[in-house]
A protein has these predicted regions:
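Extended, charged low-complexity regulatory segments
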Residues: 1-198
């Protein structure tokens, strides 16, 4: 069974992903604020206690540097989240690994990886990740990518491209080929919609 079979289901899923990204952004903003407040407390303490002994200064310096480094990484994460909020992903492949008991894995591909800590899954894979390379290198059918544990082979059963702007899906194309031209993408999408309307 295909995950998010229709365009309507895909649009609903997109809004769910954006909701999770927004929640993560709020948590990240809270974390940034906490780091800033902690650094301000250190600064105030140093200014109000001019006669601190050198040993205490050394340990405080270490804590300040750690907080600063953590704060920088949180700010970097916030910047990445801001980038993926408007356009979370642009492509998808459904891949089933060739081994017993494996199921079809929908792989959404975007400019950055997004890991959902609640469900403990990657909702979006970075386009440079080895698994994402199959989107560019293969059509439907047999496919292979190299993971840290070795070569993984299987089958691609679905390939889609999306046009998402400001968190809204403008259209999607289901195709065995990767179409890069934007005008052609839009035309293919509207033709596919017309065909579906005629069938229904």
């Amino acid at each position: 069974m295909t995950f998010n079979l229709s365009e309507q289901q895909e649009k609903k899923y997109l809004q769910q992903v954006i909701g999770i990204i927004n929640d993560t952004i709020q948590n990240t903003d809270t974390s940034v604020k906490e780091h800033v407040e902690t650094l301000q407390e250190y600064k105030d303490y140093i200014w109000s206690n001019k006669d601190i002994d050198p040993h205490e200064i050394r340990s405080m310096r270490e804590s300040i540097l750690n907080h600063f480094a953590l704060g920088e990484s949180v700010i970097d994460k916030r910047r990445r989240l801001g980038k993926i909020l408007d356009i979370p992903y642009f492509g998808r492949i459904d891949f089933e690994e060739k081994k017993n008991g494996s199921s079809v894995l929908p792989i959404y591909i975007g400019i950055h990886t997004f890991y959902d800590s609640q469900s403990k899954t990657n909702l979006i894979y970075d386009w440079r990740a080895p698994i994402s390379g199959m989107f560019y290198d293969y059509e439907l059918g047999k496919a292979v990518y190299t993971s840290p544990t070795g070569e993984i082979s299987g089958d691609i059963s679905l390939k889609r491209q999306y046009r998402i702007r400001k968190g809204k899906m403008e259209y999607m194309i289901e195709s065995s080929l990767t179409v890069h031209d934007e005008i052609l993408q839009k035309e293919l999408s509207s033709n596919a919609d017309d065909k579906m309307k005629n069938i229904v």
